[in-house]
């Protein structure tokens, strides 16, 4: 056994070296060198028959040729028979040689088209990490384990379920590359199925940014001479008549000198330095500086110190609520936001909000439950006109504006690029499909505003969009806006272990079934989820996490479950402030790798981080 374990360790180390080399932008191996790393030492005993030996399988199917029925009689399991038969038929060309057949069945090398391959290589020929077969991000798979039950579509290992002529392949974690072949050693030959190739420009997926000198405090003290935006637009001089007109009534810090046309951050925008530019669409753009990462949740200690929990538990007076937006452009609703007509305004609690408060003083909806009517009066359904279908969730923030995720509207890997004329919003709904007469309101859209630095190509950074309604909506017991957090609220509540709430009409479980009734809820679902430590979030994925994101969900050892799932995207992650009894939207459902998978979490757009961008757009286009 020691000999076998040593060979196994040798194989793992060889694979680790290969992955390291493939991810380099400058080092690519010759085929013979790659093959020497990819080929795995033979074990003392046949691993395939150590795992699969049942009945007379070896005698029936290796020493002789067998039928599927004979294989089933030996294995006595439909799933194991499917898996064995897929490999056995893929190895048909080498059945006459026992040694070659066993090598082919073990699956550590490719025979023919490589449909027999069952190894654990999980990078493509150009060095991109493979997407999990069960995941829908960043690509929606057309090939899955239901279609090919014997293809062993586990984890993110390279496979060839559909008989691709290029050999084993996978969907990639790069949104710009849907699927790509892998470089797999061919059985008994000194070559691989696909030669290793460099990617032009290198892959940015899974690679952390280099350690360089960064700009602190999101550029609030930046005094550099950069005068061009990230889109290449020249900045207007701060003293120009156009810039002065746009700056009128803005809350600028007088300590920030607005010199010439250099990028500055006079309003403390969490997005960083910016400047005015000529003409449409927004008259302002952000500048491309390398900012130091400063997550809001790590600032909590400075704000509350060790007395944070005591401050919440011992609260005696309600915090004064200060409106943030200009009502002329934002519309009505902010002064009364987050106070639900059927609960807070009626002095009632919903069934699970106590769980949220207890998490404060203690430190896709899957596994959720039916929401009470009026529980989330800010919940919005984004509805596609043709074909008619639920597209995403969203939230009402005033009588004129709706907040959602940018990827609901623009995501080329899923062929999404919707305009105002493609969509409408349904507000006040409880039922997923039924039209709720005299309760729900349907509104057309006037304009869609997507964050200019939304990064769909890599990691959905700044996954946020604003929808302006064509006409103001009328509030009711079932339609009411949610609050958006200020810094004080964000620092008090966005703490690891504190629970927030996600609502939506998304799938109840992750599945490939074709029957919608099995996975789609009939009414709005709700689940309470704890915020997760930032380091744990980063360690749970190979995708680069930014400070415009946070993650939430239960850890494998916590004994509880829950997550957002397909269809919940764009919906709100809300928390109730124990200081003023208002509900605040802290996040937007953005992305996740599968639904409710152990060790994986849901990722949310950090609303407070992007609030200044929202203010600029609303001030400019809300009139």
Swiss-Prot record:
The keyword Mitochondrion does not apply. The active site is at residues 407, 463, 569. Its EC number is 3.4.21.5. It catalyses: Selective cleavage of Arg-|-Gly bonds in fibrinogen to form fibrin and release fibrinopeptides A and B. It is an enzyme of class 3 (hydrolase). Residues 1-24 form the signal peptide. Residues 108-187, 213-292 form the Kringle domain. Coiled coil: none annotated. Residues 25-43 form a propeptide. Thrombin, which cleaves bonds after Arg and Lys, converts fibrinogen to fibrin and activates factors V, VII, VIII, XIII, and, in complex with thrombomodulin, protein C. Functions in blood homeostasis, inflammation and wound healing. Activates coagulation factor XI (F11); activation is promoted by the contact with negatively charged surfaces. Triggers the production of pro-inflammatory cytokines, such as MCP-1/CCL2 and IL8/CXCL8, in endothelial cells. PANTHER family: PROTHROMBIN (PTHR24254:SF10). This is Prothrombin. The lineage of its organism: Eukaryota, Metazoa, Chordata, Craniata, Vertebrata. The gene is F2.
């Amino acid at each position: 056994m020691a000999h076998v374990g040593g060979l196994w360790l040798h194989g793992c180390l060889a694979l680790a070296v290969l992955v390291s080399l493939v991810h380099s932008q400058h080092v690519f191996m010759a085929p013979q060198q790659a093959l020497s790393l990819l080929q795995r030492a033979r074990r003392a005993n046949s691993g395939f028959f150590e795992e699969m030996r049942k009945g007379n399988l070896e005698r029936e199917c290796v020493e002789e040729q067998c039928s599927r029925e004979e294989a089933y009689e030996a294995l006595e399991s439909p799933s194991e028979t499917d898996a064995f038969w897929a490999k056995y038929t893929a190895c048909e060309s080498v059945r006459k040689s026992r040694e070659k057949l066993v090598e082919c069945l073990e699956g550590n090398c490719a025979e023919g088209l490589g449909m027999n391959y069952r190894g654990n290589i999980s990078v493509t020929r150009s060095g991109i990490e493979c997407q999990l077969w069960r995941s829908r991000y960043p690509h929606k798979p057309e090939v899955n384990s239901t279609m090919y039950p014997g293809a062993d579509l586990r984890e993110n290992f390279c496979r060839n379920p559909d008989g691709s002529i290029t050999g084993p392949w996978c969907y990639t974690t790069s949104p710009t590359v849907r699927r790509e072949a892998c470089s797999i050693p061919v059985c008994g030959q000194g070559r691989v199925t696909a030669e290793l190739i460099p990617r032009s420009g290198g892959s940015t997926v899974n690679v952390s940014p280099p350690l360089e000198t960064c700009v602190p405090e999101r550029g609030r003290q930046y005094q550099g001479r950069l005068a061009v935006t990230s889109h290449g637009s020249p900045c207007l001089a701060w003293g120009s008549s156009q810039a002065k007109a746009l700056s009128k009534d803005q809350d600028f810090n007088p300590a920030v000198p607005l010199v010439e046309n250099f990028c500055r951050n006079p309003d403390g925008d969490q997005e960083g330095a910016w400047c005015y530019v000529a003409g449409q669409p927004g008259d302002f753009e952000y500048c491309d500086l390398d900012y130091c990462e400063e997550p809001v949740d790590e600032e909590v200690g400075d704000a509350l110190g060790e007395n944070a929990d005591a401050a919440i538990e011992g609260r005696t007076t309600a915090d004064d609520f200060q409106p943030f937006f200009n009502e002329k452009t934002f519309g009505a609703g902010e002064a009364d936001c987050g106070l639900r007509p059927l609960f807070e305004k009626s002095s009632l609690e919903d069934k699970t909000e106590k769980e949220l408060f207890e998490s404060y003083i203690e430190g896709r909806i899957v596994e959720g439950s039916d929401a009470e009517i009026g529980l989330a009066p800010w919940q919005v359904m984004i509805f596609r006109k043709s074909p008619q279908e639920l597209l995403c969730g969203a939230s009402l923030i005033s009588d004129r504006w709706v907040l959602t995720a940018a990827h609901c509207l623009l995501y080329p890997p899923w062929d999404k690029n919707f305009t105002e004329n493609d969509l409408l919003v349904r507000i006040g709904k409880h039922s997923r499909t039924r039209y709720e007469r005299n309760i729900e309101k349907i509104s057309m859209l006037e304009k869609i505003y997507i964050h200019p630095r939304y990064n769909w190509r890599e990691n959905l950074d700044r996954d946020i969009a604003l929808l302006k309604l064509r006409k103001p909506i009328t509030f009711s017991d079932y339609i009411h806006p949610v609050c958006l957090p200020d810094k004080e609220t964000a620092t008090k509540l966005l703490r690891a272990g504190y629970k927030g709430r996600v609502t939506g009409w998304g799938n109840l479980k992750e599945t490939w079934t074709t029957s919608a009734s099995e996975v789609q809820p009939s009414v709005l679902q709700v689940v309470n989820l704890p915020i997760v430590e930032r380091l744990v979030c980063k360690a749970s994925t190979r995708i680069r996490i930014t400070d415009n994101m946070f993650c939430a969900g239960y850890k494998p050892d916590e004994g509880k479950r829950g997550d957002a799932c397909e269809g919940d995207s764009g919906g709100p992650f809300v928390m109730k402030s124990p200081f003023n009894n208002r509900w605040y939207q802290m996040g937007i459902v953005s992305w996740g790798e599968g639904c409710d998978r152990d060790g994986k979490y849901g990722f949310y757009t950090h609303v407070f981080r992007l609030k200044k961008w929202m203010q600029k757009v609303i001030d400019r286009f809300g009139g």
